[in-house]
Design a protein with these regions (language model features):
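Cytoplasmic-side transmembrane-helix entry/capping segments in multi-pass membrane proteins
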Residues: 49-59, 82-84, 105-115, 145-152, ...
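Conserved small/polar residues in nucleotide/adenosyl-binding loops
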Residues: 1-3
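Interfacial loop-to-transmembrane junctions
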Residues: 190-213
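Transmembrane helix exit motif
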Residues: 37-45, 68, 82-107, 193-194, ...
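Hydrophobic alpha-helical transmembrane segments in multi-pass integral membrane proteins
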Residues: 66-71, 121-127, 161-164, 215-225
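Small-residue-rich hydrophobic segments that form or flank transmembrane alpha-helices
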Residues: 5-54, 115, 119-122, 129-190
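Glycine/small-residue-rich loop that forms an oxyanion/phosphate-binding "nest" at active or ligand-binding sites
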Residues: 48-95
């Protein structure tokens, strides 16, 4: 996780303080999709080193559509509680076992559920980074493969979310703020790549886990404070 997936984590809580969650999610949907497409394209040469992307992507799209409709129908609190619990377990596991990784066989079995949960969170609350970031991190992929995996999955879930928002009419009257957010979002891509290249593999691991922990804390504060 880095600049590309911190956009909704930072923007949605801030926007939610002055408006409703539906407006916050709609405002961030287009900029978030563009930044992830840009990052995935720039790291596409690492796609052969990834794992489970097809299954995670397909189930993520399905979950994103369902989650977007849940956004206007259900309380977000149960989803946030579940997300916090999963991420807390992972952060504690990493702290106790820094070399923890999941085997290819185990990841294949769990990938459909993880992809579906990621899409549901992306559609329902606009934030799925802590979950999919934790999951991809425990694959321990090479750095650019890690980036390509996460940004591709975010782009797929974000595209499904955007289509569902359009069909549901959630972007009506919100186009201006959504489009205005695109330029500053895309401007962060080179900065994010520069920051990423300054880290060693060990520092990158620690940075990812620290970002996940901070992100889920901010989400909890935004939801329950």
């Amino acid at each position: 996780m880095c600049i590309r997936d911190s956009l909704p984590l930072v923007s949605i809580p801030i926007i939610s303080f002055v408006t409703d969650l539906e407006t916050a999610v709609a405002a961030v949907a287009i900029p978030n999709l563009l930044i992830n497409v840009a990052m995935a394209w720039r790291s596409r040469e690492s796609r052969a080193e990834t794992r489970d992307l097809s299954m995670l992507g397909a189930t993520g799209v399905a979950g994103g559509i369902v989650g977007t409709y849940a956004l206007v129908s259900f309380s977000e609190a149960p989803l946030v509680v579940a997300l916090i619990a999963v991420v807390a377990i992972y952060v504690i596991t990493f702290a106790r076992m820094p070399d923890f990784r999941i085997s290819p066989a185990a990841s294949r079995r769990a990938a459909p559920g993880v992809g579906l949960a990621t899409g549901l969170l992306q559609g329902a609350i606009g934030i799925s980074g802590p979950l999919i970031g934790s999951w991809i991190h425990c694959y321990r992929l090479e750095r650019r493969a890690h980036i390509f995996s996460i940004t591709t999955l975010f782009a797929l879930a974000g595209a499904a979310q955007l289509v569902a928002l359009l069909i549901a009419g959630e972007l009506s009257g919100r186009w201006t703020v959504a489009v205005l957010g695109c330029l500053p979002a895309l401007a962060t891509v080179p900065f994010g790549e520069h920051l990423r290249n300054r880290f060693s593999s060990e520092e990158f691991d620690r940075f990812v886990v620290a970002t996940i922990a901070v992100a889920v804390t901010a989400l909890a504060i935004r939801t329950f404070a």
